[in-house]
Amino acid sequence: MRFDIKKVLELAEKDFETAWRETRALIKDKHIDNKYPRLKPVYGKPHPVMETIERLRQAYLRMGFEEMINPVIVDEMEIYKQFGPEAMAVLDRCFYLAGLPRPDVGLGNEKVEIIKNLGIDIDEEKKERLREVLHLYKKGAIDGDDLVFEIAKALNVSNEMGLKVLETAFPEFKDLKPESTTLTLRSHMTSGWFITLSSLIKKRKLPLKLFSIDRCFRREQREDRSHLMSYHSASCVVVGEDVSVDDGKVVAEGLLAQFGFTKFKFKPDEKKSKYYTPETQTEVYAYHPKLGEWIEVATFGVYSPIALAKYNIDVPVMNLGLGVERLAMIIYGYEDVRAMVYPQFYEYRLSDRDIAGMIRVDKVPILDEFYNFANELIDICIANKDKESPCSVEVKREFNFNGERRVIKVEIFENEPNKKLLGPSVLNEVYVYDGNIYGIPPTFEGVKEQYIPILKKAKEEGVSTNIRYIDGIIYKLVAKIEEALVSNVDEFKFRVPIVRSLSDINLKIDELALKQIMGENKVIDVRGPVFLNAKVEIK
């Protein structure tokens, strides 16, 4: 809210210390349900794979590499050139592209009758136009997604009727089967690099340092926790007369050091792909101090002069590649690549912060005057909670409700002797820790020994909802006062003895959070003695 600057400065001029304390009242607290952690920052969330791709892009650029986009669709002929006798085994893991054939469809009398039976008046001119459409489609001059429109146009009917003509008069279109081509989807980035370099080698000055991060496709027998049929490769090439495997080691270290890896081992790869020069194909193992283990993260090698010669490339080329998803799993701590790449198909796990933000006060006073009264009543209860019983605290306030003057008297009492006005759990605060919900007291005095370790850990490492038992209970009490005013109830009693569940302290939890807690066998333990007794009179 805005405040009176002139008045504030005048107060400060008279007595700065007093003004400093009193102006605290000008900074209003937020509504209980708009406080942290229910109040959350709103921002977009990148996908871990896309985030890793961007980090890799920047890492390559910092190392002086130029970004390229390599061909995704590769003719099988290129695989034969690159792999030689190994090509058939490689092509077995490639996806071939297929397309529907374009049938040679005629327009005989039988089809004309079918069209007429649809209520279409078809004369010789329309027949000729329709024949021309079918002929142009066969030749490829008309695209498949334009065929219905062109049929409708030829017959001078609506698009809907054109579709009906295609379905009923030309059923042969339904029986078409895809026919494979010699085109494949890139199964690894190398197949694209040979094509790119064969074009660049005579145009650009050496050495060349190029990188490309893009999708590849591999026809796996099945997808599992570490293999997908579609993945991203972060690949680079270094092209120059003096290029060797040492360049691969340098690039691997320079690239991966930017992701927290500190030590590196290079081991000969037993696979020995034929597009690499013998004894150059190398696996990169890197040590990540956070994970405390050595991890295989990349492969590099020098392309075979035989494969290079088939593309008129006459200088050595070092190629390094790593799977983006593999690196992302390491960075973000995933154990299953499917759950990381496609989280929408897997169980989403709420963090403690998420769950804490999903715990809210159930019944809250609607009118500002009563909401403020509830806050005042909370402070009074806290100030008097340790009064020896029998005892009571009476609070009387006057309100204007629906144009009428109403006096509200609230009495908080404890009649049983040798007790206190309120029970020891009134200041317990609700925390979320490791997916569990706990009610934790300000101190652990009087708490059973076996509960202290977990409660201490939850308080230190968990997320507080910033809601105490007394908050929820008093908000409910004052909300009932509002209800009583509406219903013309003159008095009522209110009692909360022992808390056993969230509802006992006027809290509710989102169904998503509750589902996770129940599904993971977590606990909601907010038990505690409150012993709050109140009597309300309205005049």
UniProtKB/Swiss-Prot annotation:
Main EC class the enzyme belongs to: ligase
Chain positions recorded as substrate binding sites: 188-190, 233-235, 275-276, 319
UniProt keyword list: Aminoacyl-tRNA synthetase, ATP-binding, Ligase, Nucleotide-binding, Protein biosynthesis
Keyword Lyase: no
InterPro entries reported in the protein's UniProt record: aa-tRNA-synth_II, aa-tRNA-synth_II/BPL/LPL, O-Pseryl-tRNA(Cys)_ligase, Phenylalanyl-tRNA_Synthase, SepRS_C
Assembly information from the UniProt record: Homotetramer. Interacts with SepCysS.
Family as reported in the entry's similarity comment: Belongs to the class-II aminoacyl-tRNA synthetase family. O-phosphoseryl-tRNA(Cys) synthetase subfamily.
Known role: Catalyzes the attachment of O-phosphoserine (Sep) to tRNA(Cys).
Protein name: O-phosphoserine--tRNA(Cys) ligase
Species this protein is from: Methanocaldococcus jannaschii (strain ATCC 43067 / DSM 2661 / JAL-1 / JCM 10045 / NBRC 100440) (Methanococcus jannaschii)
Top-level taxonomy: Archaea, Methanobacteriati, Methanobacteriota, Methanomada group, Methanococci
Gene: sepS
